[in-house]
Amino acid sequence: MNDMNPGFVMPDVQSSHDTRQIPIQRVGVRGVRYPMSLQTPSGVLSTVGTFNLDVHLPADQKGTHMSRFVALLEEEREPLNLAQFQLLLEKMLEKLEADAGRIEVSFPYFVSKTAPVSGVQSLMDYEVTMIGEVRDGHTTVRVKALVPVTSLCPCSKKISQYGAHNQRSHITIDAELAADTPVEALIRMAEEEASCELWGLLKRPDEKFVTERAYENPKFVEDLVRDIAMRLNEDDRIVAYTLEAENFESIHNHSAYALIERDKRRAG
């Protein structure tokens, strides 16, 4: 029953004509986990990416070619930087015969850090996402980094005789870049403007430093986004950004949140 005649041509259902005449803005695959490598200032970093890939489907085409998305990843062997990621996006459009599409890949990004007093080394992990999109003939590539930090409440410090409440916070920078900017640059901006940065491994002298550093540098969630926004505004490598801060309040069962968006190509 499964035998095929030598001259048999398997039908390509996806490429057949669709009579409903409704275009689909985005169709593809999501949650594809694949090994990948990144070109970083310190060398090539191996990690695992979770990919979402999709393209625009014309109104007269029944379906896209789903297998080609995974085939694209299987063929990709070059370490990714922004330029290579944009090339991957162009390859996808060519392979899928599409005029618009989007690739999003999220991955853990590890940075070796040195403790502030003891000097012990440890790895710190960050959640990084690269997003590339072609629409109306225009290509955009963005990098998003989620940076965990410590924040300490200025009000609590002011009104308390002993100490002040502090908590872990998440800074998220989603930036469109004019140049191949290392993701570490975005991470450092967030860490340097927090009450204190985090480390994977600390000794007792380091804990003392972290506690006192945060106490000497209290910041509301509003302070966090404003101070980081000043850094982003001054950096010519950054064309546009969405900046978010969320403080997981230690004295409440809710978070404090702030957001700033700016596109430098627009006035104001």
Curated annotation (Swiss-Prot):
GO MF annotation, one: GTP cyclohydrolase I activity
GO BP terms: tetrahydrofolate biosynthetic process
InterPro entries listed in its UniProt record: GTP_cyclohydrolase_FolE2, GTP_cyclohydrolase_FolE2/MptA
EC number: 3.5.4.16
Pathway per the UniProt entry: Cofactor biosynthesis; 7,8-dihydroneopterin triphosphate biosynthesis; 7,8-dihydroneopterin triphosphate from GTP: step 1/1
Keyword Flavoprotein: no
Catalysed reactions, semicolon-separated: GTP + H2O = 7,8-dihydroneopterin 3'-triphosphate + formate + H(+)
Key words, A-Z: Hydrolase
Residues the record marks as site: May be catalytically important: C153
Any Pfam family matching the protein: GCHY-1
Class of the enzyme per the UniProt entry, highest EC level: hydrolase
Function: Converts GTP to 7,8-dihydroneopterin triphosphate.
HAMAP family to which the protein is assigned, alphabetical: GTP_cyclohydrol_B
Entry similarity comment: Belongs to the GTP cyclohydrolase IV family.
Designated name of the protein: GTP cyclohydrolase FolE2
The species this protein was found in: Ralstonia nicotianae (strain ATCC BAA-1114 / GMI1000)
Taxonomic placement: Bacteria, Pseudomonadati, Pseudomonadota, Betaproteobacteria, Burkholderiales
